[in-house]
Design a protein with these regions (language model features):
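Conserved CoA-thioester-binding segment of acyl-CoA-metabolizing enzymes
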Residues: 1-54
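Glycine- (often His-adjacent) and acidic-residue-rich active-site loop
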Residues: 55-88
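Glycine-rich beta-to-alpha active-site loop
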Residues: 88-137
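Well-ordered beta-strand positions
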Residues: 111, 117, 156, 160-162, ...
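Hydrophobic, secondary-structure "cap" segments at the distal end of domains
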Residues: 143-152
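Acidic, divalent-metal-coordinating active-site segment for phosphoryl/phosphodiester hydrolysis
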Residues: 162-168
């Protein structure tokens, strides 16, 4: 597998793997561009229902942005490429699952927080050394951290540079589930499969509403339109019929 972002799919589930294990899966600018292309493909293909994001190997999810690949000084980061990718990932109209296969460091924490779910191995840990190198993090990333982990845990991670490990990450809400390394793929697949089995109009629509609510920018009119669309959809009729017949529904996204 070549270095960079490797994209694969299995039915309704797609996986993007950060493949730079020799560099702790640190992200180059080209990798961030590649993640945009992945999201372009996922958005264009409605048969893809869930996107899994992970890192290659079994030690590190990602060490964040490769600082050796950063140039241009502070002004060049007014439009922070990592923040732009994370914002888009957060709003992607598909369910996203971060497969946490080890350490999540620096900006990779923000990337993982932009996913809807995080499922990790028991070796999972996060650490953000921003305060140790004099860096002020993006408000959008701090908002995501507060929303997922709560204010106090976010303070510990960003102000004290504490390393939080799997059990604590589960307690504060960062990890939805954690398990042994040998069972990680099965745990991730269970979440991805559950997400993929829901009615597309319902899942994608409610994800959009939840994202807007978390950002404090709900488009109430658009949300009401999505609700009306769901009530009138073939999928809702199919869902009710499936319940009555005691079978699995066959949703078409319409």
């Amino acid at each position: 597998m070549e270095e960079g972002i490797h994209f694969a799919r299995d039915g309704a589930i797609a996986t993007a793997t950060i493949n730079r294990p020799d560099k702790r899966n640190a992200l180059k600018m080209a990798d961030l561009d590649a993640l945009h292309r992945v999201m372009d493909e996922v958005e264009a293909d409605k048969s893809i229902r869930t996107l899994i994001l992970t890192g290659a190997g079994d030690r590190v999810f990602s060490a964040g942005v490769d600082l050796s690949d950063v140039g241009g000084g502070a002004a060049a980061w007014d439009d922070n490429p990592l923040r732009i990718v994370s914002d888009r990932l957060e709003a992607l109209p598909r369910v996203t699952v971060a497969r946490i296969n080890g350490a999540v460091i620096g900006g990779a924490v923000e990337l993982s927080l932009a996913c809807d779910f995080r499922v990790g191995a028991d070796s999972s840990k996060i650490m953000v050394p921003a305060a140790k190198i004099g860096l002020h993090y993006e408000p959008a990333g701090l908002r995501r951290a507060m929303g997922v982990m709560g204010l106090q845990a976010a303070r510990r991670v960003y102000l004290l540079c504490e390393t939080l490990e799997a059990m604590e990450l589960h307690r504060v809400g960062y990890l939805d589930k954690f398990t042994t390394a040998s069972e990680l793929d099965a745990a991730v697949d269970a979440v991805a499969s559950a997400a993929s089995s829901g009615a597309p109009l319902s899942v994608d629509g409610m994800k959009r509403t939840l994202t807007e609510l978390s950002r404090g920018v709900l488009d109430e009119k658009a949300a009401r339109a999505r609700i009306r669309e769901s009530w009138a959809s073939d999928d809702m009729r199919e869902g009710l019929a499936a319940i009555q017949a005691g079978r699995k529904p066959d949703f078409k996204g319409r």
